[in-house]
């Protein structure tokens, strides 16, 4: 099959780019012809709260990646749509996570599929964004109405999708992020991160935004009595750091703050020092961070929002709690009850079987075959 993947890829950073590149490799492994078309401009700097959108690492040698898509240039969308219409791949595989992408993606898809051969298939992260705007619904309608089939990764997203599109849609959970490698020896990981190996660490990992509830976790952790446990916060602030200052000052050295983007080469170290990952989210669909934890067999505390309880069954590899200070506090204290972390560790091999890239790519082909 001839496949063009449209979305984030090198040199763009983060989990979305990793997902697209991993799927490209899986389809290449199966013998498909795969090209990846990524952005020449993803976000204008005014709309990007981080420090950099790209990485300095060399491009992967095993993938065909072209930077051809400008989200702010309608003439570019039209030209790329006509290029794809002429190239006539069997499948255009797109990832959708924010309505900001809808005008660009929707225009390209609508033009490309007019050749009567190409089907547009979407792996969809979110329908309704975490931060809402008036343009969200019309933008969603424009893009989602141009897609021939979907794979969604939480039942919440599947339900939201039905309000916009009648095309075939299949559930498949977010696969594990395996490209981060294996767990390191804890002492080695502590040394690499400059951490005191005599302490134990809970991990909050990823971009820091209001809906992720870091303030809930900080308040909950303040109430946890065990002074031998530290909270390791690793990620770049995408909102105002000042709103956390009072909490951070009260907690003092009980919180270790690494407030910068964590490059792929360092991810294994953070998960190798952690007793558990805590996701105190106020809202969620699913989270790619849980799939990093699965890769490293790190137990989790997640809140009962969106698709998180689907990914982390309560009492098997972690705890599901209410998105409140008291709920998170109780779950953290339960983690350190005798035998709990060991029991969770023993359950990981069976739970990990649900999250393969092969299954995800199979589901995308399945919905491609169902699409008209």
Residue ranges and their predicted role:
Residues 242-268:
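Nucleotide-activated donor-binding/catalytic signature segment of Leloir-type glycosyltransferases, i.e.
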Residues 195-212, 218-221, 232:
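Conserved donor-binding/catalytic core segment of Leloir-type glycosyltransferases
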Residues 145-184:
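Donor nucleotide-sugar binding/catalytic pocket of nucleotide-sugar-dependent glycosyltransferases
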Residues 276-279, 293, 299-302, 312:
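Short hydrophobic beta-strand element within catalytic cores of glycosyltransferases
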Residues 9-13, 25-86, 157, 237-240:
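N-terminal strand-loop element at the rim of the active site
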Residues 314-326, 332-339:
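Conserved acidic donor-binding segment of nucleotide-sugar-dependent glycosyltransferases
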Residues 269-285, 298:
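Acidic donor-binding loop of glycosyltransferase active sites
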Residues 39-44, 205, 230-243, 260:
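Glycosyltransferase donor-sugar binding loop
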């Amino acid at each position: 099959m001839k496949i063009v993947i449209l979305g984030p890829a090198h040199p763009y950073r983060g989990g979305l780019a990793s997902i697209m590149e991993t799927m490209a490799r899986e389809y290449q492994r199966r013998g498909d012809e795969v090209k990846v078309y990524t952005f020449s401009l993803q976000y204008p700097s005014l709309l990007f709260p981080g420090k950099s959108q790209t990485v300095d690492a060399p491009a992967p040698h095993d993938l065909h990646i072209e930077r051809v898509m400008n989200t702010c240039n309608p003439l570019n969308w039209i030209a790329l749509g006509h290029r794809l219409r002429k190239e006539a791949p069997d499948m255009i595989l797109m990832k959708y996570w924010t309505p900001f992408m809808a005008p660009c993606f929707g225009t390209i898809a609508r033009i490309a599929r007019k050749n009567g051969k190409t089907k547009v298939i979407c792996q969809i992260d979110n329908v309704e964004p975490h931060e809402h705007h008036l343009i969200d619904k019309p933008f969603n309608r424009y893009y989602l109405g141009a897609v021939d089939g979907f794979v969604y990764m939480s039942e919440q997203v599947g339900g939201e999708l039905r309000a916009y599109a009648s095309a075939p849609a299949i559930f498949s959970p977010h696969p594990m992020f395996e490209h981060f490698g294996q767990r390191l020896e804890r002492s080695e990981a502590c040394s690499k991160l400059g951490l005191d190996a005599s302490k134990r660490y809970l991990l909050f990992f990823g971009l820091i935004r209001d809906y992720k509830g870091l303030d809930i976790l900080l308040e909950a952790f303040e109430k946890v009595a065990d002074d031998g446990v530290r909270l390791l916060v690793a990620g770049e602030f995408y909102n105002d750091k000042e709103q956390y200052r009072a909490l951070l000052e009260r907690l003092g050295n009980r919180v270790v703050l690494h407030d910068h983007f964590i490059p792929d080469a360092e991810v294994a170290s953070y998960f190798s020092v952690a007793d558990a990952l805590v996701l105190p989210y106020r809202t969620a669909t699913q989270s790619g961070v849980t799939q990093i934890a699965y890769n490293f067999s790190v137990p989790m505390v997640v809140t009962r929002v969106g698709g998180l309880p689907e990914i982390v069954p309560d009492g098997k590899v972690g705890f599901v709690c209410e998105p409140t200070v008291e709920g998170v506090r109780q779950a953290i204290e339960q983690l350190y009850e005798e035998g709990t972390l060991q029991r969770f560790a023993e359950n990981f091999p069976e739970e990990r079987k649900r999250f393969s890239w092969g299954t995800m790519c199979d589901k995308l082909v399945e919905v491609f075959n169902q699409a008209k």
